[in-house]
Amino acid sequence: MKELNEEVSRKLELIRAALTETGATGVRLKGTDWFAWATAGASNTVLLTAETGVAEVLVTIRDAWVLTDEIEAQRLEDEELSADFKLHVNPWADAAARESFVRDVTNEGKVLSDVCDKAKRLRPIPHVEKRLPASLQHHKRVMMSSELERYREVGRKASVAMTEVLSKAQPTWTEYQLAGAGAEALWARGLHPALTLVAGERRLPLYRHATATGEAIGQQAMLVFCARGYGLYANLTRFVSFGSLGDERAELHRHVREIEAQALNLCKPGTSLDAVYHALAQAYEQHGFPNAIREHHQGGTTGYLAREIVANPTTIDTLSEGIPVAWNPSLPGAKVEDTFVILQDGTLENLTFDPNWPSVEVEGRLRPVPLELT
């Protein structure tokens, strides 16, 4: 018999507090991110590139449902959902039946919905569905202890997959082959390869967001993962060099590690994201690269999205205990990125650290260096 989930029960309390706060009669959560959050890591994903899934959560003051169709219902009930949710099933060809059900159980009142968020392409029903309050959005960004345990698992698996793939890579591989090997290693560990960026030797200095091509990687390559498990994203970047990296390239990597350290040093409860951005801008300038901050975003908070909030000069959102972050400072041909979480004592835990990957200490933290294969 299915059991109730303590984490889900707590989240239903938070959702119902949002109902009380706003005077709404229901909350609909359709995005892959919000569905995973509300269900303690369940997935409504079928199409990996979709921002909304094949099921949604509906919560009223009294009840909590998962709404889906006849195609998905049995699998979701058997494999994904706890006993906290009732299941409402509509015919796959009759989407109007679901909307009628929602109107009935919410007494045709105001409904809050995550599809008002900028990340979602679906639009809410005009004059009925409203944006989720900031209080609930904040709760989604702060990890509970049970979420953090799942996050550690995702981060560990993603980092081990990265090490495995780059350790066996060959300079004759195409960028497609390296991206495919990365995706395979993630799938083998039960993680979605939400993003696998690859740049080989020629393209590395040219593009920050290097989507893979059929070109051979040559003497060095960058591999980037945004790996999703339980709805949580582990974000990391690593480099491999076939033979010695060389002094000039090694110096670029040193610069980005030291620039990143300024961001990590500020990741404490109460720090605003714009303060971190400005610290990074200053660090780039001090290292002799004043325009580099304009060439790529620098990262921000992460969690149920690869980036929940991207830091910019005016981002006033503040960090707190339990918020995960992923910064990604870069220069032409060099970048550093891992996923961290702010702990109760204000320190950072690296969720994507692999002790088998080469590293150096930077301001008290072990940070990755390119893997040199001979």
Please report, for each region that a protein language model flagged, where it lies by residue.
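Active-site neighborhoods and metal-handling regions in enzymes and metal-associated proteins
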Residues: M1-T374
